[in-house]
Amino acid sequence: FFFKQKTAYEIPKRDWSSDVCSSDLRLKTDNPGSTAFMQMRVDEALRAGRPMRLRQHWVPLDRMAPVLRQAVLVSEDAKFWDHDGLDYDELRISIQQDWARGRLFRGASTITQQLAKNLYLSASKTPTRKFAELLLTRRLEAELPKRRILELYLNLIEWGDGIWGADAAARAYFGVPASDVSAPQAALLAGAIINPRIYNPSRPSPYLLRR
């Protein structure tokens, strides 16, 4: 479908905290049809003079291949089940390296942090945006079970130009639903998350194969 309307989950600049509270409650049971990050990509496409066709097929976590879920956790957030949304060791290293460089560079984002960014924020690397991400991350962890956070993440993560979520990615790159992804396919899909608009799981680069 072609997406042009403003996403219901995009936070206005005024009084964003109350909007987050209400949307967090909806996220317990409702599957968002769009996110702020999706809207950002749509806006980029419109400015470039091309429509953005979004491909996304929402599937429950239990209908995603276990090897795919595990591959994403290993690649993106090995401590997911144990932390409270933030990996403090990685966060400390990130702050130290960013301070040395004089700018925000290193990601060190957990799955919950990435979900917070995708739902509500932009991709900009500014201290203000990063601070908002940390606050939103803690709120998501407080309001949602871990399995729901993982389900939301796997259905909303960007996996290529106009490709969102595990099922759309599995079908686009390998012609199978997320439930039928093999272990090698899962590894390639997980490895591409780091930069999904560059790395193509169906035509993996040497770097992606190493990941």
Give the ranges of each region predicted by the language model.
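Juxtamembrane regions of bacterial inner-membrane/periplasmic proteins
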Residues: S17-R211
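Single conserved hydrophobic/aromatic residue that forms the stacking wall/gate
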Residues: F1-V20
